[in-house]
Structure formats: structure tokens, C-alpha cells
């Protein structure tokens, strides 16, 4: 897709995403849907768990952070069980999708 320089979309106010943040403690794998918050702040207090992204969708994105204070990882996977990122305690990732894949854009 190509963009043009015509008619930029301007937002003259700050953006508020009501319900867009989900701080949650997980004890089992978490499967996301497009009804879930875009920002997932997950605390994993058990062994390594998976956070499974929804089906591929052009332009979709999720921010996922491992809020654990222990050594328990969260493995972010796509719907086909491919690993996108492994998050140690305190790490987060921005995942973006097109119609055929998820990618990790920023991780740290």
C-alpha cells in the first residue's frame, strides 16, 4: 500500500483508549482476540507461559509486557504457534501484523 501526501489526518487532542490497558496476572496461557485491550501488562507468577496473538489482520498491533518480578518468561506466539518474542521479567514487545504474519518491531 502506498500513502499520498494529500489530506493528512490530524488529531488536535490527546488520544484516550478507554479500556485499552489490561493489567492481569496469568496462571495459564493467554489467547488474545481483537476484543482484548491493545496493551497487555501481564504478570506471570508460574512457569513459562504463552501469550497467543489473534489471527493475522492487516495493520493490527498489540503491546505486551511481562510484569513478573521473577524469572518466569512469557513467550509471545502467533496463531500457528510460531514464536514471535520471548519476554523475560520487565521486558515488553510491540507486535504488528499484516494479512499473513506477526512481527516484533520493538523489544526490550
What are the language-model segments listed below?
Residues 37, 88-92:
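Tight coil/turn sites that cap or link beta-strands
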Residues 53-54, 84-86:
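Short, surface-exposed secondary-structure edge patches
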Residues 78-84:
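Short edge-strand/loop segments of extracellular domains
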Residues 2-76, 98-108:
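Exposed extracellular interaction/assembly regions and N-terminal maturation sites
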Residues 88, 97-98:
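Generic beta-strand structural signal
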